[in-house]
UniProtKB/Swiss-Prot annotation:
Binding site for ATP: N186, T222, L223, G224, K225, Q226, G227, G253, D254, N279
Species for this entry: Staphylococcus aureus (strain COL)
Family, per entry: Belongs to the carbohydrate kinase PfkB family. Ribokinase subfamily.
Catalytic activity: D-ribose + ATP = D-ribose 5-phosphate + ADP + H(+)
Residues the record lists as binding K(+): D248, T250, T285, K288, G290, S294
Pathway in which the depicted protein is active: Carbohydrate metabolism; D-ribose degradation; D-ribose 5-phosphate from beta-D-ribopyranose: step 2/2
Residues annotated as binding substrate: N12, V13, D14, G41, K42, G43, A44, N45, E142, D254
Keywords recorded for this protein, A-Z: ATP-binding, Carbohydrate metabolism, Cytoplasm, Kinase, Magnesium, Metal-binding, Nucleotide-binding, Potassium, Transferase
Name of the gene: rbsK
UniProt feature coiled coil, ranges: none
Protein name in UniProt: Ribokinase
HAMAP family in the record: Ribokinase
SUPFAM superfamilies, per database record: Ribokinase-like
Function, as annotated: Catalyzes the phosphorylation of ribose at O-5 in a reaction requiring ATP and magnesium. The resulting D-ribose-5-phosphate can then be used either for sythesis of nucleotides, histidine, and tryptophan, or as a component of the pentose phosphate pathway.
NCBIfam families the record matches: D_ribokin_bact (TIGR02152)
Length: 304
């Protein structure tokens, strides 16, 4: 059965620079390549990934009236994303991200939130019909927390599973933590929230146990090329990553989440399989440059 997924999150226009290495303070370096603008934002990336895995995907986001995101709206339509709840506002410009990728494929990202940061609980309430009919509601932290709380409250009241990707990393209020069914941090985000640095298998377990102890039912800690560690009250497992030559890690985590929620059963009885599917999809993403441009189609993932 096809999963119905609502993504609440950011839409950005990404500007990419390819560099041999990162500059030191006060240093000027030549850029290897300056690429044209691409669609991005954690929310948009996750929506694209979910839709390309052929889940029934609705996206709640906010963009400016500046027209710079019009090409992204076309990308959403091509991906068959329900754009009924995409809001245009004159309050701020469309969000932007400035991304540098070095020779090792690692990236740094600087984000201007723009219209994303004008998302309100009222905007979310206007999308209530989509939320209550979903299997999963997914959010990140590139929109205001009150809007996320509103979405998760609606979801929980109607038996919809909530998924939080706590990125960019920041402290979370208890009001939000109490509404999370599945949390998907990376090592840095997990450490910030739990206070436990992820250095080995035991610290991964300790980290996951922290989230379980505060009432979150399912914990996934993404570990980059080391794969994903997951835990529930009944089971835990380290799922290995697929070994590939990574050239750009941009959107790898977003691809993982989109693929994961597209495959996960509502009962979560296929948790390990859904995580492996997410790992497989993200292993394709890191072999290409760009964010949404690098997110694979379901047919490509199935060929791995």
């Amino acid at each position: 059965m096809t999963n119905k997924v609502v993504i609440l999150g950011s839409t950005n226009v990404d500007q990419f620079l390819t560099v041999e290495r990162y500059a030191q303070p006060g240093e000027t370096l030549h850029v290897e390549e300056a690429q044209k603008a691409f669609g991005g934002g954690k929310g948009a990336n996750q929506a694209i990934a979910t839709a390309r895995m052929q889940a029934d995907t609705t996206f709640i986001t906010k963009i400016g009236t500046d027209g710079v995101a019009d090409f992204i709206l076309e990308d959403f339509k091509v991906a068959h994303i329900d754009t009924s709840y995409i809001i245009k506002t004159a309050e701020a410009k469309t969000g932007q991200a400035f991304i540098t990728v070095n020779a090792e494929g690692q990236n740094t990202i600087y984000v201007y939130g723009g219209a994303n940061m004008t998302m309100t609980p009222e905007d979310v309430i206007n999308a209530k019909d989509a939320i209550i009919n979903a299997d999963f509601v997914v959010a990140q932290l590139e929109v205001p927390i009150p809007a996320i709380i509103s979405a998760f409250e609606i979801a929980k009241a109607h038996g919809v599973t909530t998924v939080l990707n706590p990125a960019p990393a920041k402290a979370l209020p208890n009001e939000l933590l109490s509404l999370i069914d599945i949390i998907v941090p990376n090592e840095t985000e997990a450490e910030l929230l739990s206070g436990i640095k992820v250095t080995n298998e035991q610290s991964m377990k300790d980290n996951a146990n922290y989230f379980l102890s505060i009432g979150i039912k399912t914990v996934l800690i993404t570990l980059g090329k080391q794969g994903t560690y997951f835990a529930t009250k009944n089971q835990s497992q380290h799922i290995e990553a697929y070994k590939v030559n990574a050239i750009d890690t941009t959107a790898a985590g977003d691809t993982f989440i989109g693929a994961f929620v597209s495959r996960l059963n509502k009962s979560q009885d296929n948790l390990a399989d859904a995580i492996d599917f997410g790992n497989k999809a993200s292993s394709l993403t890191v072999q290409k440059h760009g964010a949404q441009a690098s997110i694979p189609l379901l047919e490509e993932v199935n060929q791995v």
